[in-house]
Amino acid sequence: MHKQPKLLPPPATPPPPPQSSSWSGNIVFTIKINIWLRVFSHSSPTGLPKPHSPMPSPPEPEHSVGKPANVQIPQVSSPEFCNQKSVLATEHAQT
């Protein structure tokens, strides 16, 4: 009984056009990257990132590269990749 309702939502994700999906994925990806960069930058001063991330030095350079990287994200990220991310997000939200 519980498996039936869970199987219904997943199939509803692929129907949307790939263009729309890819755009949404790119936007979400960019936002996630920005948040991650900000979190890492804020965590740097705390001193916790040392054990958390093996590269405590690159936080600053990464921030600068983040801007150009965001522009290339759409080219590097393919519709399939975005679709996978969407499916993962739906599964996580349901769980």
Curated annotation (Swiss-Prot):
Bias type Pro residues, positions: 7-19
Residues covered by region (Disordered): 1-24, 43-70
One of the protein's GO biological processes: signal transduction
Domain of life: Eukaryota
Signal peptide interval: none
Tissue: Expressed in fetal tissues.
Extra information: This protein is coded from a SMAD5 gene antisense transcript.
The protein's name: SMAD5 antisense gene protein 1
Naturally occurring in which organism (per UniProt): Homo sapiens
